[in-house]
């Protein structure tokens, strides 16, 4: 029953968000600002394209976790950039231990948001270490990937999930390797 309740809750949230978006568009049209309505529709289209690219990775639990965090960032007017270099994951990363993994990822996003840099960069890729998610508040931290031996490994006791952190000044990056 818990799964059904979660599903219904998600549907209610999506319906609420959709109705809010319609109200914004309708408001622009009422005050005779069709350009504002078009810009808002364009913004929604770009946001949905980003979310769609994440779901193409074919891990719904992982995608839902990222979607929730990204939408929270957008609601708080934080710019989100997403770069995906793989077509899909080889396995479903969040299928096992979803609650633990999503709670940890949520904590990462909240920490980055609290730096007040108003940017979160998400990079999904694969290299010699495996399929990975890089989340940072500074896109330049992407260059630090080649120095992984200097990153701090975080032990969260979740199988098939390695987490590393790098930070200096107010710049923070996390790399999750699956």
Model-predicted regions and their roles:
Residues 15-31, 92-124, 150-151:
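Conserved ATP-binding N-box helix of the HATPase_c
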Residues 87, 96, 110, 114-145:
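Conserved beta-strand-loop-beta-strand hairpin that lines the nucleotide-binding pocket
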Residues 144-169:
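ATP phosphate-binding glycine-rich loop and adjacent ATP-lid/helix-beta elements
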């Amino acid at each position: 029953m818990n799964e059904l309740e979660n599903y219904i809750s998600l549907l209610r949230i999506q319906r609420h968000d959709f109705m809010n978006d319609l109200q914004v568009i309708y408001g622009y049209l009422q005050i005779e600002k069709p350009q504002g309505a078009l810009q808002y529709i364009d913004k929604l289209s770009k946001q949905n394209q980003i979310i769609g690219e994440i779901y193409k990775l074919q891990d719904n639990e992982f995608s839902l976790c990222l979607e929730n965090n990204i939408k929270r960032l957008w609601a708080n007017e934080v710019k989100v950039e997403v770069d995906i270099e793989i077509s899909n994951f080889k396995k479903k990363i969040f299928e096992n231990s979803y609650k633990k993994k999503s709670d940890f990822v949520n904590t990462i996003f909240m920490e980055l948001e609290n730096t007040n840099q108003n940017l979160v960069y998400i990079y999904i890729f694969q290299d010699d270490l495996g399929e990975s998610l890089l989340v940072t508040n500074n896109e330049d931290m992407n260059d630090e990937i080649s120095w992984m031996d200097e990153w701090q490994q975080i032990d969260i006791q979740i199988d098939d999930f390695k987490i590393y952190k790098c930070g200096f000044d107010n710049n923070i990056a996390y790399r999750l390797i699956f």
